[in-house]
Amino acid sequence: MNPFTLYWAGRMPVTAFLSSYALGLDRPDQWETWFYSLGGLDIARKAFAEQGLFYVGPVQHDLNIIHSKKPIRRFEDFKGVKIRVPGGMIAEIFAAAGASTVLLPGGEVYPALERGVIDAADFVGPAVNYNLGFHQVAKYIIMGPPETPSIHQPVDLMDITINMNRWRALPKSLQERFIAAVHEWSWVHYAGIQKANLEAWPKYRQAGVEVIRLSNEDVRKFRRLAIPIWFKWAKMDKYSREAFASQLEYMKGIGYVTDEELKGLSL
């Protein structure tokens, strides 16, 4: 299988920590470091093994952006906005900001925006969304400041998983080659998406779409909401706790969170 990992979160809470989440690790290289140098891959494989699956590896994809029918220029403007998000931790953070969150399958997002059933929608990145026609039904794209371009899902990871019995039946040499191929494909795929994004941005401008950048102060307001929700989700099962504890130490080490922000919170 090759899904977006976080869509398992209803069944496997740990998957909320196997892809990016609001104001956490926000660069592809950080996720690469966590998976391949800080134990993330082992955590993912243990968790998926309990579902009868072998987690081959993550696949880098893109950041997610928000398309909106109305201008959202500051944190407070999210209040009352009916927004489609993928659920889980992300939905809870937007709800805490006052938005009305909606779950919709991918195929229903465009028509929901077109008909005004929703005001805004998280979806994938610029190139994919342009090809799907989002510029036709939403004249605003909402992003964070340049250093935090996606406040809610900056590194939307996919994964490759295989039925465990099928995996075990493969020769060791073939398993090793397949793991290496997935790792290489991850970055080939990512690079292709980034090239397509560069080509998509001028098309949005030509279509009259305005890109709105939230401020650093808006990001700080979202962060204050997000951090307690991180801890809530981390307590949902043993793998969530293990994954987040590791990521939290990483974030502390690179200055993403401070002791003051974590005051009163524990795993």
Question: What does each model-found stretch correspond to?
Answer:
Residues 1-31, 39-267:
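N-terminal secretory/targeting leader peptides
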